[in-house]
Amino acid sequence: NITFDGAGNITVADPIATGSGTLTKTGSGTLTLSAANTYTGATTISAGVAAISNNTSLGTTDAATTIASGAALNVSGGVTVAEAITINGTGVSSNGAIRSTSGDNTFSGLITLGAHSEIQSDDDTLTLNVSSGNAITGTYNLKFDGSGDTTVDDPIATSSGTFTKAGSGTLLLEGTNTFTGNT
């Protein structure tokens, strides 16, 4: 298991290959992961920001990633993240628990809402495209924000939560959505 902690910024440019070990990000700083990582354990972003720019920066898809309330996953560079992810909250400074900062980025794993949450696209296009099933599930409020565009190709299957679109970017919903809360 490996933990990155502290208020400063840490950049890891070499691959992390801890086998079945976990990766945990704590502390208010930013952890930048740019390599193709091969660890198979879970990834937990407990505080601060984890910034990724490689399809497998979060390791293999064997275990999921969890983003805690007040933490964020920033994605850039035109990557496709196949990892299943649970998001909890609106991220750092309410800029999204998942934040696409640059490039056309794609999430192809299920996103589960563990709490009221926000997804933000700052630039270019963020696409949520799961090969089968729902793109987003959960029973909490969901907000899409930002000046970049977001496309959700598969169903949003949230219940009882409020669905909100904010920011100047375009939100395109292409799935047969089953959310039942207010819009």
Where are the predicted features?
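Beta-strand-rich extracellular passenger or scaffold domains
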Residues: 1-183
